[in-house]
Amino acid sequence: MTFKEHLLQVKRLHEFIRTKSTGTPETLAKRLEISRATVFRRLDDLKNLGAEIEFDRDRMTYYYTEPYDLRL
């Protein structure tokens, strides 16, 4: 995987989280065309950039607990 592909995955993940439309980790993996394990690595990438992320079990989506603006 190239660095550009890595950044694109993070950016797409951010958009799904921002709009609260991620679905489950399995669904998200399919939407991003990556493995479930990579979903968790990309979530960690965002968290390492300062994002506070939680999973809402009722709505079945990841969301930001505080406003977050991704700047790459």
Give residue ranges: language-model regions.
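Conserved segment of winged-helix/HTH DNA-binding domains
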Residues: 67-72
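Key DNA-contact positions within bacterial/archaeal DNA-binding proteins
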Residues: 37
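Alpha-helical residues within the helix-turn-helix
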Residues: 30, 47
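Extreme N-terminal segment that seeds HTH/winged-HTH DNA-binding domains in transcriptional regulators
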Residues: 1-23
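Minor-groove-contacting beta-hairpin "wing" of winged helix-turn-helix DNA-binding domains
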Residues: 53-66
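Alpha-helical residues within helix-turn-helix
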Residues: 26-27
